[in-house]
Each structure stands twice: as C-alpha cells, then as structure tokens.
Amino acid sequence: MNNWDKIWKKRTAEIDHAGTVFETFKELKRADGFDTQDVDGYYEAFYRQWEVMAERIAAGCNERVESLYEIGCGSGVNLFLFSRVKKVGRLGGLDYSPNLIKIAKGVMPDTDLKCDEALNADIDLKYDVVLADSVFQYFNDVAYGQSVLQRMWDKADKMVVITEVHDQAKKTEHMAYRR
C-alpha cells in the first residue's frame, strides 16, 4: 500500500465500551488517530458531522438502512454509532490495520470485520450501504481508488457513500500535516 501502514499498524488502544455511547465514540476516534487536539467541542464536532452523514444516508435510502459496510473502518467508530444510535442490524467492515480491526472486534464482536486492503473487499455479500469515510486519500493512486469504487458499487444494494475526497493539489501539504 504505502507508508501509512507503518503508522496504522502501531495504533493500539483498550476501549472501555461500558461507558456512554459518546464516551466510547471518543475513545474509538482517538484510536483512529484523532487525538491531536483536546479542545472543547473537538469530539462533539465529529459527532455532529457523523449525525449529518447518517441522516443523509437514511434520507437517501427512504429511511430504511438495514445493513451497512465500511471500507477503511479503522476502529469501527462509524459502525459502532450505526449499531447503537441508528440500530442498523447487519454491519461489516474492512481495514488495512490489524490492530484497528482488533479494537473494532473488541467493541462489536458480532460484526463482520476483516483485515485486508480495500481492493480485496468481498462483493458477494451485499449491503444496503457501502461507506468509505475519509480513506480515499490513503490510496496510492487514482486507478486504485477507481477500482475500490467499482467494488463498493458492486457490493452495495442501495447506496455508495464516499466522504472527504481531498484536493490532489494539496496532497503533499495534507500528508505532512497528518504525520
């Protein structure tokens, strides 16, 4: 893939999922690398962003989302919220980091989770919605992203959602900031 695998393979966390949904959400976001700022409203803003995304997905599916699969699910933060807040019955995900998949399985042991590259997503088992939230910028090139998008399309019964597709002209600046 690229050098990001070195970063993600080092991520570990013990998640106390006995707390509130919001507290678990914050811990999962931290495990995914959103731990660089600790200012008032930081995690609340991410939660509101998720709520908006979830409402748009629901509206686009006529309020009937029974299954959702996430490419690049990381620690499972989105899947966790779709399970607990939106009560989506069948969830699945795939991520490149074995440590993040381990965290996700610890919080959601009955979820279909796999450690693999995005391009290897199984398209035989369909889901209503297939989501890729802020992962396309980690792909090596446009051709890889196009191939992943095709697999997402083939896997989805109702909707494909891709968030945060970054401006290629600012890729170097963005990667430097994230490191």
Where are the model-predicted features located?
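Short catalytic micro-motifs in class I SAM-dependent methyltransferases
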Residues: S134-Y138
